Swiss-Prot record:
A lipid is attached at residue 22 (N-palmitoyl cysteine). It is a lipid-anchor. It comes from Sodalis glossinidius (strain morsitans). Monomer. Plays a critical role in the incorporation of lipoproteins in the outer membrane after they are released by the LolA protein. One of its GO terms (cellular component) is cell outer membrane. InterPro entries: LolA/LolB/LppX (IPR029046), OM_lipoprot_LolB (IPR004565). Belongs to the LolB family. SUPFAM superfamilies: Prokaryotic lipoproteins and lipoprotein localization factors. This is Outer-membrane lipoprotein LolB.
Length: 206
């Protein structure tokens, strides 16, 4: 798997407009503590979600490249998920299936790659550092293994810091869907050094 920056990410920049246009909601009032009943109840509700699907826009920005795509994340169990990246015209650019012990990626030319570590595979093939193993929790609004995190006034996750494989990731939550039960993130930003990842979740299916 020595190929790098292959055609899978030759995407149109239209999706960046979707990310730029997203609204950011910052609740007012004092932040809740990690021991607050609001956070504990919310955390318990999120942890009970075993199957879900979310669709939206994805951006990866670094000094080497800028990648924009639409995404569909399908979580079928705690350790099984599928991530589909499409261009704004609807054509599939990448289809990643992850199961315990094996990850399979198919690019837009139908070429298939298999690895036991999806993060390493994405890094080698596309030159993108994405903390996939933690992202499942972070997308839901859970801190995962992170212990350094803050909450907003409603008891929802607001920021977190987590060291992953020697890299310090900072995650900022910029909005939540109030029409879902429990409330789920609508916008979040990840930063690690010069690398930035932006996710805009347009819809959730539980």
């Amino acid at each position: 798997m020595h190929e790098r920056n292959y055609a899978v990410f030759r995407l149109l920049p239209l999706a960046s407009l979707l990310l730029a246009a997203c609204s950011v909601h910052t609740p007012s009032g004092p932040a809740k503590s990690q021991t607050s009943p609001e956070w504990r109840a919310h955390q318990q509700s999120l942890s009970a979600l075993g199957r879900y699907q979310t669709r939206g826009a994805f951006a990866y920005l670094s000094s080497q490249q800028k990648v924009y795509a639409l995404f569909n994340w399908q979580q079928t169990s705690a350790d099984r998920y599928r991530l589909i990246l499409t261009n704004p015209l609807g054509s599939t650019e990448m289809d990643l299936n992850v199961q315990p012990g094996v990850a399979q990626l198919v690019n837009n030319q139908g070429k298939r790659y298999v690895s036991d570590d999806p993060e390493v595979m994405i890094q080698k093939l596309a030159g993108m550092s994405i903390p996939l193993n933690d992202l499942r929790q972070w997308m839901l609004g859970l801190p995962g293994d992170a212990t350094d995190f803050t909450l907003d006034s409603r008891g929802y996750l607001h920021t977190l810091n987590y060291s992953h494989n020697g890299q310090l990731w900072t995650v900022t939550y910029q909005g939540y869907h109030d029409d879902t039960v429990p409330a789920l993130p609508s916008n979040l930003k990840l930063r690690q050094g010069d690398n930035r990842i932006k996710l805009k979740m347009d819809s959730w299916s539980l």
